[in-house]
Amino acid sequence: MIEVQDPFVGRTLDEKYRVEERLAAGGMGAVYRARHLLMDRPVALKFLHQRLVEDEAARVRFLTEARAAVKLRHPNAVSVTDFGQTSEGCIYIVMELLEGRTLREILSREAPLETARAISIMLQTSGAVAAAHEAGIIHRDLKPSNILITQSADHPAVVKVLDFGIATFSADDDEDVIVPTQTNTVIGTPRYMSPEQHNGAELTPATDVYSLGVILYEMLTGTVPFSGATPAEIAQKHANNAPFSPREIVAAIPPEVERIVLHALEKQPSHRPANAGKFRNELLDTAERLGLEHHAIKSAPDIEVLRDAGVESPSGRLVVDISRLREKRALSSGSNEIKILGAPPAQESKPNNEPSSSSSFIDKLKRILGKPQKSTKHN
C-alpha cells in the first residue's frame, strides 16, 4: 500500500509557521498542528478548500465574517490570530491550539450531565456567543462538536466555542449536513438548527439561542429534542412538534431550568430570548436563585476567587460559601458573574476596536481574497 504524503506537513508557511501534523479533516478542509517559529509556540492552522476562495459570493461573505471574527475577544471563544495563503492558493486561518474533549465526546460517554455541570458549561458557551452577537456575528452552527472543554491544573473545565466567523463554511465532522431549500442553501446541523434556519429564512441572534437551547436540552436529558431518518423529517419536527418536557426524561431537572430550555426552543424567534446575552442572564439568575454555586461548578478564569470563598472536597470539587463569596463580590469592582460561576460575563466581552491589529489583519485578508487564483507572500 502506497502512503500518500500530506501536502502541508513539514512545510514552513509565510516563513513563520512550520506545519507538524494533521489533527483533523472534513468535507470543507483540515486542521493542522503547527509551530510559530518566531514566538516558539504551538498554533493551529485551519485550511479552507480552494472552491470557497474561487467563489465570489463566498469570498465576500468570508471577508465580512473574518472582519468580525478578528475583533471578537472572549475567554470562551477560540482566538483567531492570523491569516495566510499558500503558493498553491490554499487559504488558512491561524488559531490558538486547544487540547481537550469536545462536548460531543463528553456527552457520548457521560450524558445526561448533572444540572450544575450543564449550566456551568452553558454559561460559558452562551457568554462567548453573546460576545459574538455584540460584534455582529451569528454563529449558525452551534452544536456539541463545536464546543471544546479544555482542562488544566490551573483552570479546570474551561469552555471554548469553535468556528466563530467561519461557521457557515465549516464541515469538520460527520454531523454536518448541507440542506438545500427552495430559497437558499442552508449549511448547518439539522438536529441543532432552528425552524427558520431549516426554512432558509433570515437569521437573527435568536437562531443561535435556539441551538443553545437544543444543546442544553441534550446535556440535561441525554437526547436531542428532535431526530429523524432524514434532514427533511427533522426539519418538519422542529417546525411543528413540541419537544418532550425535559423533566419527563430526567425528573431531577429543576422546573425553573426546564422553563429556560423550553423558552429557548420556542418555534417563533420573537418568542425566544432575543440574543445569547438575554438567554445567559435568564440562566444565571436561575442558577443563583437555586443556589447551584454550591454544586461542583468548575471554573473558567478567576478560579482563585472561588477558591478563596470556598473549600475543595476530597474529590477535588469546589464548594463555595455563598456569604463569603458575596462579601468578596461587594469589595470587588467590575463583573461579579465570573466570580460566582466561573462563566465570563457577556457584558464584559466587548469587540476589540484596536485599529492597529485588526486593520492589518483585514488588509491582509483583502489582499489575499482579492487574488484567489494567484498567491504571493504577504507581510
Segments predicted by a language model, with ranges:
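Conserved ATP-binding/catalytic core of the eukaryotic-like protein kinase fold
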Residues: M1-F244, D363, L369, K377-H378
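Juxtacatalytic C-terminal regulatory tail of Ser/Thr protein kinases
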Residues: Q5, A274-G342, S349, S357
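Phosphate/oxyanion-binding loops and surfaces in catalytic or ligand/nucleic-acid-binding neighborhoods
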Residues: R101, M219, N241, K267, ...
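Charged, solvent-exposed alpha-helical segments that act as regulatory interaction surfaces
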Residues: D172-E175, P225, S270, E288-A296
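Conserved C-terminal C-lobe helix
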Residues: A252-L265
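A conserved short helix/loop substructure at the end of the activation segment
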Residues: E266-N275
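Long, low-complexity, intrinsically disordered segments
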Residues: I340, K350-N379
